[in-house]
Design a protein with these regions (language model features):
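Ligand-binding loop in jelly-roll beta-barrel domains
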Residues: 82-99
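Hydrophobic residues on conserved beta-strands that form the core of alpha/beta folds
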Residues: 30-32, 98
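Short acidic-glycine-tyrosine-enriched beta hairpin
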Residues: 67-81
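Short, conserved beta-strand element in jelly-roll/cupin
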Residues: 34-36, 45-62
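A short, N-terminal "cap"/entry segment at the start of jelly-roll beta-barrel domains
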Residues: 1-29, 42
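Structural motif
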Residues: 29, 52, 59-61, 68, ...
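Short histidine-centered beta-strand/loop micro-motifs
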Residues: 20-24, 33, 41-46, 88-90
Length: 99
């Protein structure tokens, strides 16, 4: 099958794994994540690819090149290639779920 079709909201809510790859193609990867309360993805940089992230559930912060941005349900983050970034779950109670 070419392409990938899913109910991304349902897949994100249901995911309990830190990182689960749903689909990979030559130029794109679809991943759902669940970050435990107080957890983070860890600072990283992708030299040659931009990233798009969307928060489905929870509260957190995005840190892009040292600048912090508050996040909650429905927020999206676009991370340009070469940008140091981290996503942190600021809740003490619920997982931060995103794709």
């Amino acid at each position: 099958m070419k392409g990938y079709i899913t109910d991304i909201e349902k897949a994100t809510f249901a995911n309990e794994d830190f990182r689960r790859v749903l689909y990979t193609s030559k130029h794109q990867q679809l991943v759902v994540m669940s970050i435990v309360p107080g957890g983070e993805i860890g600072e990283e940089t992708h030299a040659d690819v931009d990233q798009f992230l969307r928060i489905e559930v929870g509260q957190g912060k995005a840190i892009l090149d040292g600048v912090e941005h508050e996040l909650s349900d429905g927020f999206s983050i676009t991370v340009p290639a070469g940008t140091k970034h981290n996503i942190v779950n600021t809740s003490a109670e619920i997982p931060l779920k995103l794709y």
